[in-house]
Amino acid sequence: MSIQAEAMALVEAVESDVRGLMDAHLERREHWYAHEIVPWELGRNFRDEPWSPEQATLSPEVRTALVLNLLTEDNLPYYHAQFQVFFGPDSPLSEWSRLWTAEEGQHAIAIRNYLLTSRNCDPDVLEDDRVATVRKGWVGAMDTAIDLFNYTAAQELATRISHRNAGAKADCGVAREVMNRVAADENHHFIFYRGVVTAMLDQSPDLTLESMAKVMGGFEMPGTGIPQFRRRAVEMAKLGVYNVRIHLENVVSPLLRYWKVDSLTGLTSVGAKAQERLMTLQDDLTTQAEKFEARLAGKKVRLA
């Protein structure tokens, strides 16, 4: 049996879990409306009153974090398309992907409307960057459906943390509320994806661990096609919104602990090797974090 066939067989084996996780999500998540949060009363016509930097009320670093997070959300069509690669329209996972896409769609609406009404971004640059980002496209390094769920479990947790931290750095109650709402949604989505991976681990630990080691070992946030991504990501890292240390301590290590990866037994040689790679990954990330922090202390972190 090919790896694709094995992966799809595993997906079919956890379909009942998927249904239960989706029902739990619908019961748990509180629906919200972005238009109730956005400060419309601050809005002014950009044609009559063009934007200028002194109108901004947030620091340049916080504005960078909010804009980068927004542009990452703008790539939603590509994230949705990843599900269509693996699942037919009648699959419960396609049903989930439509629900997830509908909920995710409000995130960009909320962040963009806040930034525009509060004049905390250059509207022309923001729109040009959105167009460039979407035209660039995004294709995740996911060969199988198992890869998809290992990636989304880590990515949704990482995105939750990035949104929450960006809001916490903002000297504005509305910005914090917007980002906290978005982060709460990401947490609900993370719980779903983590649950799918948990079910897969129960059914086939070897296949799931092999995929997990590959995905976590080469993990990238889905925003690398954004204009000036490296410079913006470094600014966010320096601000403490998201960096290697945060990725290690708030994403990788908690997930590996939750899944008890270090204590899984009865593995084949393939699973055992993947298990070893995952445990070693934490040491590798620690080294990367220490190097970044040393460079930051010496002010040698390049922005371009």
Where are these regions (language model features)?
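Non-heme di-metal
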Residues: 1-304
